[in-house]
Amino acid sequence: MSRFAYTSIAILALFIGCSSEEQASLPASSGEKFSSGVHYEILDNPTTVRDPSKIEVTEVFWFGCNHCYALEPYIADWKKNVSSDVAFIKSPATWNEMLKKHASIYYTAKALGIEQQFVPAAFNTIQNEGRMLTGNTELEYFFRGFNVDKNKYKAVSTSFGVRNAVDQADKKMKQWQ
């Protein structure tokens, strides 16, 4: 398993393990300082950030990941109170073809302006209904539930903008490995 996968699992375990507000705030409330190698890792190849004046927090997710699904409500709550000097970025995982397909549908929804409604619905469909949302006909039907007709879905999902967004997410994933 790659170092990125171990780090991702450790971060997810930290969030899932912090199931109460009291537990989540222990390091800050106890005066403990965060330490490299204990609370975070310094990347060998530091990544660039969009705005150096902000703290960038990137959530790497996959609609098929039950841990990502379980984390969504906590992230939504956290985002409500996040400081103005924090930039939150949602980035789909892309390490295989199925994940790239799901990255494509995420960026399609984002381009169509339906990301807020789409993300919980996609998680629910995959996690609770067991439908993987990978076939074109299935996706056309799924997007119809957001008032997106088949032709609009096809045009946006195959657009340069969506393909480029998936490629950029994939480059970031490889940079973090």
Please name every model-derived segment:
Residues 4-97, 170:
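Extracytoplasmic thiol/disulfide redox context detector
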Residues 95-177:
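Cysteine-centric redox/oxidoreductase cores and disulfide-bonded domains
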